[in-house]
């Protein structure tokens, strides 16, 4: 009797790990490299009202997330999740985010890489610098930069995002998808309204956020990011 019970117990112990493994496979765990994008810092811009530059800190990050998320080989952390974490942890509140702080944030959201950066708009001359940080080592993997006139702001964001994909060892987009991304041109005016919508949204000023999303869509009706943002904040 004891012999039969022992055999049954051994069988159960052997089967249990297998069952757990199958359940893990069934859950379809996402093994793609995670990428988190933090708000970009204004490095001392001139030529527009201060709120526009404050908004761009969020808008550039939002558009960078969108460009990176177009690559199906990456798992990009949602902007709202990053904003909530920054508020809860008071991380980076004292100024520029250090590689060590970026790595800490990356670990909290399960990312392999964190992207931070700065921008400066000097009366229409625009420059963007982005750093990709390895979360495990806190080391800066690469710094990517681009500069142009402010009216081509979206081109700068897209160019830098494309290079960052390569730095993160992601394969390039399929040709058809890449051509579609390249054919899209987001006017700087629409991007500015979108950025201000994010600023008001994060402040809890829903009515103003709705107004800015609508203004962005009035300038560029095909603005998918503004359409999605409006759906999130507009009262049902």
Model segments located where?
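Short beta-strand->alpha-helix linker/helix-N-cap micro-motif
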Residues: 27-99, 114-123, 141-142
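Catalytic-center loop of serine/cysteine hydrolases
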Residues: 83-191
């Amino acid at each position: 009797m004891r012999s039969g019970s022992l055999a049954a117990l051994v069988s159960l112990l052997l089967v249990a790990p297998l069952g757990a493994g199958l359940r893990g496979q069934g859950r379809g765990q996402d093994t793609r490299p995670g990428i988190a994008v933090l708000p970009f810092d204004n490095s001392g811009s001139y030529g527009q009202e201060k709120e526009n530059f404050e908004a761009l800190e969020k808008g550039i990050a939002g558009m960078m997330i969108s460009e990176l998320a177009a690559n199906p080989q990456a798992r990009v952390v949602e902007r709202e999740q990053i904003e909530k974490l920054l508020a809860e942890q008071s991380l980076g509140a004292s100024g520029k985010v250090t590689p060590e702080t970026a790595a800490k944030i990356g670990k909290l959201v399960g990312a392999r890489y964190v992207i931070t950066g700065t921008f400066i708009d000097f009366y229409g001359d625009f420059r963007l610098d982005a750093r990709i940080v390895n979360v495990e080592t806190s080391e800066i993997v690469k710094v990517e930069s681009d500069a142009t006139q402010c009216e081509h702001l979206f081109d700068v964001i897209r160019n830098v995002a494309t290079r960052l994909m390569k730095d993160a060892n992601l394969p390039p987009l399929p040709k058809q998808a890449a051509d579609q991304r390249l054919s899209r041109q987001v006017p700087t005016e629409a991007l500015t309204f979108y950025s201000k919508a994010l600023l008001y949204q994060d402040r809890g000023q829903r009515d103003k956020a709705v107004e800015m999303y609508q203004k962005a869509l009035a300038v560029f009706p095909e603005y998918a990011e503004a359409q999605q943002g409006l759906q999130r904040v507009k009262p049902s």
